Amino acid sequence: MMEVRPTTLIDHINSPADLRALKPEQLPQVCRELRRYILEVLSVTPGHLGSSLGAVDFTVALHYVFDTPYDRIVWDVGHQAYSHKILTGRREDFRHLRQWGGISGFPSPKESEYDTFPAGHASNSISAALGMAVASAAKDEKRKVIAVIGDGSMTGGMAFEGLNNASSFPNNLLIILNDNNMSIDRNVGGLNRYMVDILTSKTYNTIRYDLYKGLRKINLISETNRKNLLRFNNSFKALLARESNLFEGFSIRYFGPVDGNNVLRLVEVLNQIKDMAGPKILHLRTIKGKGYSPAEKQATIWHAPGEFDIKSGERKKGENKPEPPKFQDVFGHTLVELADRDERIVGVTPAMPTGCSMTFLMKKYPNRAYDVGIAEGHAVTFSAGLAKEGLIPFCNIYSSFIQRGYDQVIHDVALSGSHVVICLDRAGLVGEDGATHHGVFDMAFLRCVPDIVVASPLNEHELRNLMLTAYKGYDGPMVIRYPRGKGVLTDWRNTPRLVEIARGRCLTEGEAIAFLSIGPIGNMVQKVVERLAEKGVSAAHYDMVFLKPLDEEMLHGIAKKFDTIISVEDGCIQGGFGSAVMEFMADHDYHPRIRRVGVPDRFIGQGSVPEQYADCGMDADSLLHLTEELLLHP
């Protein structure tokens, strides 16, 4: 007989209105059920676990106190918003999280009206929420706007730009600071709770507001004096609370810290402050992985653990057989090898040391590896400063995040010719993280930058060769892009060798058609060439290696030999590698028939990389079909 799962409270919550119909004393049970459901789904459908478990209580409290979707919640990054998705009509869809045709792992306005603003990258929530609050006030709408931002995102400069601007507006903006990493000193003891109770009480704030209004009415206080009075008030609060607070330096009212995993306390505090005028910050202390002991004890590992057994807490592993390593680990090991050779080599990462395997260098040379926080622009310019003083920085940034440091790449690295090696991790389509995390634009926006070299390795050996070349064979800025996940070689520890800049290679000679590829997608192209050979079609395959500068000598030879060329890249076709090939042909009056294969001009949703390749016509079957069509209709 099939076991029937008992009905729970969340089975009857199809919108926040259903949640608000519950009694306050039922909310702790809702939180427990949400955590249980998140664990149930994520144990077999991997996603971001730790942050989502920690955010359950304040998510429930926000939807209980505020009138969503009329009131707006703007999520920063958004991978902590799983309980938000479950509470807003996507409970059953949650079982297909991050899957092809399923729901995104991040807030997406295309998916739900409750997802008010797209999320995926860090530090933008305050600016977006402030814009919404100002627009609502301009339309005389009484809605409240809430930005939810983690302490990690507060290292991003845009967050401080938003805070600085927010102090100029009187609008009802609430910033929830989700502090789960002890990066902001906490107040302790009974005095702190007493101060929070007083400062959030309606009596205190009514008197405070009425006093200010009265003084303004009789012209005893100007706007400048109001700010001075606010600073005095904040200084008095800091004296009583024994804390100097940077947020109130922006003239933004601060409340907290408050236990962010106590839903009833949160409902109480939110009800007290929700109608207060002006921008304010509620500082919540949460536990990452709350409610699941393994995740609480090892927050980094359980941030996104993959599949796991809920009862034992054991993460599931693949078969115990030799497999290619991740490109990330090849980068990490190779960086350590180079650092062994030259003490000038250092590593820089903006808050992704584990993901990019910079931890290998940190472990062996802790004083030569720098995690600068979520601050990509700073990471690039910091690296340029290191290079200025004679060091050789390897700055590792995810491809989708280098977009946030583009000006610095141009102004602070390329313009000065700094010897900075920028390693773009997770280049190309990345799978389940979806549109916000695909690294598909870098080739298009980097190849137009003067005095910079851009390359992409076919495999792990070539990655090691390019890293050595960037260190020892070239003294200017160089970008090396490579994908997320495993490569193709089990025996990857070659002795690295210098390669010639702007030199590609022919992988397969052929006569009927030429494939030009760049990067690891060339391994798939090579399989297509082999399948064509089985059908009697002689196809050539060239691994270009360098996007900038191109191997022009090789391109001249290809143009003179072939009437039909297919370029293949794991990036956007607008302005990318294929466009560079077409520009070369046009500039030199060659007229071959060229077809570009790559990511089309649209955002690609979440799913597996093979599913995304097929959707974009970048998989082997699509490439084979395209080739046959071109050969049938010369």
UniProtKB/Swiss-Prot annotation:
Record's protein name: 1-deoxy-D-xylulose-5-phosphate synthase
GO molecular function: 1-deoxy-D-xylulose-5-phosphate synthase activity; magnesium ion binding; thiamine pyrophosphate binding
EC number from the UniProt entry: 2.2.1.7
PANTHER family listed in its UniProt record: 1-D-DEOXYXYLULOSE 5-PHOSPHATE SYNTHASE-RELATED, 1-DEOXY-D-XYLULOSE-5-PHOSPHATE SYNTHASE, CHLOROPLASTIC
Catalytic activity: D-glyceraldehyde 3-phosphate + pyruvate + H(+) = 1-deoxy-D-xylulose 5-phosphate + CO2
Alphabetized UniProt keyword annotations: Isoprene biosynthesis, Magnesium, Metal-binding, Thiamine biosynthesis, Thiamine pyrophosphate, Transferase
Highest taxon of source: Bacteria
Organism, scientific name: Porphyromonas gingivalis (strain ATCC 33277 / DSM 20709 / CIP 103683 / JCM 12257 / NCTC 11834 / 2561)
Cofactor(s) it depends on: Mg(2+); thiamine diphosphate
Role summary: Catalyzes the acyloin condensation reaction between C atoms 2 and 3 of pyruvate and glyceraldehyde 3-phosphate to yield 1-deoxy-D-xylulose-5-phosphate (DXP).
NCBIfam families xref list: dxs (TIGR00204), PRK05444.2-2 (NF003933)
Subunit record text: Homodimer.
Residues binding Mg(2+), per UniProt: 151, 180
A GO CC term assigned to this protein in UniProt: cytosol
Gene for this chain: dxs
Entry-linked Pfam families: DXP_synthase_N, Transket_pyr, Transketolase_C
GO biological process: one example: thiamine biosynthetic process
